[in-house]
Amino acid sequence: AEEVTVWEKHKEGIMSEHIWAPELHYLDGKWYIYFAGGDKDDIWAIRPYVLECADADPLTGAWTEKGKMGRADADEFSFEAFSLDATVFENKGKHYYVWAEKVGVGKQISNLYIGEMETPYKLKTVQVLLTSPDYDWERVGFWVNEGPAVIHHDGRIYLTYSASETGAAYCMGMLTADEDSDLLDPKSWTKERYPVLRTDDSRGIYGPGHNSFTEDEEGNPVMVYHARTEAEIEGNPLYNPNRHAMLMKIRWDEKTGAPIFSYED
């Protein structure tokens, strides 16, 4: 399909620099784009923002800015610091918002948080910490959990995320919860001890991560992710843009029902 520009970044102020990680979602009869952006005068003041389209076709409809994602009235923490990579999912008639946000002084840590949504652009509940970079493979270069994505299957919710710096060490982890559990209770989620997808030197695929899930024309699940084709990067990998979009078919484990992430697919 032909690319269509639906919005342009501001020339100054908020939403004027580092426009990152857009996701398109359909909620309550309208289209929404969730993205992160910075400020030309403070380029690392990355915060989450929302665009809305009330027309049936998001390619031709008019988009309006809903501004910065709103936190719950009792929440004094969410979106105060570097926040990005938001995704949205529905379960049992409720919508949930998951995002990455940094905490700490000096060497900062990027955690994943979840909140129930009151509207498509405001949270209903105070944020809940889902996962922090606990393991060594989540702490290479930087201590990072980011890029959440959700897929449902057979009564289970699978939440993938990306970890470590964005070079060859970048990889995917996963959390799992029962769809009937309290998704705002961290105890409902089980975290995989090891990455579910990582660098495969034999295939020349390095640092896979920040994936999303969609379906092909026949309704089969497909994962879209980015990865590098070179192992070595000069300088800080954060400033190296050479990451490529890739596709992977998703199969399901016959015993556990969990998604299988395999380069063979």
Task: For each feature predicted by the language model, list its residue ranges.
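Carbohydrate-active catalytic/glycan-binding domains of CAZyme proteins
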Residues: 1-265
